[in-house]
Amino acid sequence: MMPELGNFLLCLAAGLALLLSVYPLWGAARQDRRLMALARPLACGLFACIGVAFLLLVHAFVVNDFTVRYVAENSNSALPVWYRVAATWGAHEGSLLLWVLLLSVWTFAVAIFSRRMPLDAVARVLAVMGMIAFGFLLFILFTSNPFSRGLPQYPIDGRDLNPLLQDIGMIFHPPILYMGYVGFSVAFAFAIASLLAGRLDTAWARWSRPWTQAAWMFLTLGIVLGSAWAYYELGWGGWWFWDPVENASFMPWLVGTALLHSLAVTEKRGSFRAWTVLLAIAAFSLCLLGTFLVRSGGLVSVHAFASDPSRGLFILVLLIVAIGGSLLLYALKGGRVRARVEHTLWSRESFLLGNNILLMAAMLVVLLGTLLPLVHKELGLGSISIGEPFFNTMFTALMAPFALLLGLGPLIRWRRDDVARQIKRLIIALLVTLSLSLALPWLLQDRITAMAVIGLMMALWVLIFALMEVHERATHRHGFWRGLRTLTRSQWGMVLGHVGVAVTVIGITFSQNYSVERDVRMRPGDSIDIHRYHFVFNGVRNIVGPNWTGGEGIIAVTRNGRPEATLYAEKRFYTASRMMMTEAAISGGLTRDLYAALGEELSDGSWAVRLYYKPFVRWIWYGGVLMALGGLCCMLDPRYRMRKKLQEAS
């Protein structure tokens, strides 16, 4: 009975989404307040229906209702209950329902927290989000219904959740990543609503900016969690593989970063209006493209869902309608929102525009490297592979000027500035950056490489100018310590975001240039030295888990004769799915990780063991967290609410 109720609620939600996409929009066109006022209750009803339907699917997993085909294919009675809950979004149908649930959450949030906006603006925004929800609900109901029964025959037990997904990271990574993905629908809806109204001003940017910051924050955290999961779960010792589906989340992040900075210019200076609208359309379009890539069945990826071509065709139609319709509207009405605001080449506007162009160029590089192999294969031209060297080379070339502009930009004045005013800062920053970039690799790793110096120069340049920015703002009217307390959340958010970029680049630089990897055969008692650390293999013991059995390799690590860590690398056999998995052992620290992965037992009784020394690898994720915190600070800045109150009072 519960699955049938879930089906009914999805049908009801589709009906509400259709009403939400029609009535408020019609009311806004006719200035009928009665029709526009329907937007908020319809949005709340949509959220309630999808929310309850999702809880019913979770309930089916928790109680092991194997009459539901999706549950039987992705769960098992021996699966721990928390993984049963995570299995709800572990495959195509459930993850798509999660996608729509989070879309309804964003729709509900806009309905609740936009009460100071004009009613016609809210009506248009919610109507656009209703259209998106309606399209995806149709997709679920016709091709991907998670409530489909397997009657009259159904299995006594389920196939089990993919062992790769039986990890604590998979409980949090997909929902947070999807919150970012779907969150850009709000920026998209604001952009389309503004085009429909023919009005795009600083108020539009101020309304849209906190929602964009929230979406960007969630997407940043989702990417960080996914990278960390790949690092410790896949057993390869890497944190980013330029996998097509990883790229599908990275592209909207790049465009979203450009959008955040462009919104700042539109809000404060009234310029970049048409460009900002185009970025909002592009960010959400890339989110839809990522959804298509994951579910089309055309990609080989550890992240891709096994899917039939009809599903990919349905999403492709949605993609064409959404992108084509929005670009057509932009072509028809984009000219009306353009604004001419004069500024010189040496101005903050020019620096932000330059960084926007570099971010879009980086996105196009990733898009080309992701889609070209797929297009090449579909055209019958054979298989080609675009790998890490291409992406790394192109990104380094683009990110060097990006870091240059990112560091200096916040210290440049709006509209125009004097180059001579910055000469002293430029000389100091250049000398400190160059000195530290040469000294740190030698002090920490005993050798210097050209790529390490380039990477550290990029990071330290951004970091030094971020500190200069804090000092200048704090001492503008007060003493330094008193001035720190006067900085706004938005200013702290910008500094945290830029420092986060620097910290991430430091982590990438050291881990890419100074990591050490060894693949060895080891018997109990064998040892090997890796970068000042002595690894001793103490054999393998049997272990048993809730739904798996396996072996645990014990590796003692010492440094200068003193115990440093004991690594317990596992090899697990999942009985339900009959799959063997590797669980890496990691001893983490602020400046280094020691990493071990247990391979197969060899014929002579020895074991294949992979050992890594990875310096500063965690800084990659620390920087991502700092960036997300920066987004949170900006999002919570009360100045937006204060401005609205002042406008209303006047």
Describe these PLM feature segments.
Residues 1-34, 50-52, 66-68, 244-254, ...:
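Contiguous transmembrane helix-bundle modules in multi-pass membrane proteins
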Residues 86-87, 162-167, 591-623:
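Short, aromatic-rich amphipathic segments at membrane interfaces
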Residues 11-22, 28, 32, 95-227, ...:
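A conserved hydrophobic secondary-structure block that centers on an alpha-helix together
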Residues 39-48, 128-129, 203-225, 270-287, ...:
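Interfacial and helix-entry/exit segments of alpha-helical transmembrane bundles
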Residues 175, 182-192, 203-262, 275, ...:
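Extended, hydrophobic alpha-helical segments in both membrane/secreted and soluble proteins
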Residues 518-610:
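Soluble non-transmembrane domains of integral membrane proteins
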Residues 30-39, 113-125, 197-209, 267-275, ...:
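Membrane-interface helix-boundary motifs at transmembrane edges
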Residues 51-126, 132, 141-161, 223-267, ...:
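Membrane-interface helix-loop-helix modules in multi-pass inner-membrane proteins
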